[in-house]
């Protein structure tokens, strides 16, 4: 019996990853980075910027600044942006899967499935963001009194993602926050 494996043609050189703060890729303030290893080979495949407190402070300032704009955007506009992100996720699913396989050791088909499901999640939350309504609640004690519930974005949200589902878990958190008008700070594995 012959057992063979195939690699997709989309396997690429793993990128050295910087921090994404205020819409720009940047090195960590201290210039530190950590090695990323392929778990199948044990070889270093790239480096990732190692954020410290000054980087977190910059990210929080940027998230607060972004929140001031994002929260005032109409839900239909946020929906369009998020649907574009979902389309890009689908378009780049093979490359995303290749990187996940290299850095996580995740089987290629599972990695591609994770990217595709993440795109579905982004769309679902984008559509839910169109339905963030308030409500009127009658008083339990006085029928002439009503309470109005207004749902407002609360501000920047922090999200941490585990190593085993690094895309899906962060997308579940990020898409919900963005759809409701909040900005994000994400700590990946």
Predicted ranges, named:
Residues 1-40:
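Hydrophobic face of amphipathic alpha-helices that form TPR/SEL1-like repeat modules
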Residues 135-189:
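Conserved small-residue-rich beta-alpha loop and adjacent elements
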Residues 35-36, 53-56, 167:
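A short local loop/turn or secondary-structure capping micro-motif enriched for an aromatic residue
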Residues 45-132:
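Glycine-rich loop-to-alpha-helix module at the N-terminal edge of alpha/beta enzyme cores
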Residues 28, 48, 187-188:
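Small/polar loops that bind or transfer phosphate-bearing groups
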């Amino acid at each position: 019996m012959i057992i063979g494996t195939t690699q997709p043609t989309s396997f690429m050189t793993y990128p050295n990853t910087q921090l994404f703060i205020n819409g720009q890729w940047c090195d960590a303030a201290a210039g530190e980075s950590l090695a990323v290893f392929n778990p199948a080979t044990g070889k270093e495949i790239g480096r990732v910027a190692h954020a410290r407190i000054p980087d977190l402070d910059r990210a929080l300032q940027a998230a607060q600044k972004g929140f001031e704009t994002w929260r005032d955007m109409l839900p239909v506009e946020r929906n369009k942006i998020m649907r574009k992100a979902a389309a890009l996720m689908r378009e780049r699913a093979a490359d995303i899967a290749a990187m996940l396989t290299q850095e996580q050791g995740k089987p290629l088909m599972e990695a591609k499935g994770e990217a595709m499901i993440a795109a579905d999640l982004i769309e679902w939350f984008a559509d839910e963001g169109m339905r963030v309504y308030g409500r009127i609640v009658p008083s339990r004690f006085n029928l002439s009194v009503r309470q109005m519930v207004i749902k407002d974005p609360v501000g920047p949200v922090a999200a941490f993602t585990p190593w085993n589902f690094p895309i899906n878990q962060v997308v579940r958190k990020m898409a919900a926050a963005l759809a409701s008008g909040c900005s994000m700070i994400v700590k990946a594995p």
